[in-house]
């Protein structure tokens, strides 16, 4: 359950805004995902992912 679930959460995270951060620092984000993703629930987001989301939100508001 843990191994299969980890793969599923990584794929789901890749589809969201974290996907852009993964391309930049794939190794760091994957390690953080394994430590901070429990059952698909984010306990804490990496600062890089938070910055990416903030940038995207600001862009949407301008549009």
Swiss-Prot record:
> According to its UniProt record, which protein family does this protein belong to?
Belongs to the OCC1 family.
**Low complexity: bias regions:** 1-12
Tell me the protein's name: Overexpressed in colon carcinoma 1 protein
Question: In this record, what's one Pfam family?
Answer: OCC1
**Which interval of the chain is the signal sequence?**
none
Stretches assigned to coiled coil:
none
Tissues where this protein is expressed: High expression in placenta, skeletal muscle, kidney and pancreas tissues. Absent or very faint expression in heart, brain, lung and liver. Expressed during adipogenic differentiation of mesenchymal stem cells (at protein level).
Note down the stretches annotated as region Disordered: 1-41
InterPro entries recorded: OCC1
């Amino acid at each position: 359950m843990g191994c299969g679930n980890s793969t599923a959460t990584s794929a789901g995270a890749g589809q969201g805004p974290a996907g852009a951060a993964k391309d930049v620092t794939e190794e760091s984000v994957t390690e953080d995902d394994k430590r901070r993703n429990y059952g698909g629930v984010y306990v804490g987001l990496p600062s890089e992912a938070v910055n990416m989301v903030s940038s995207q939100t600001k862009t949407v508001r301008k549009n």
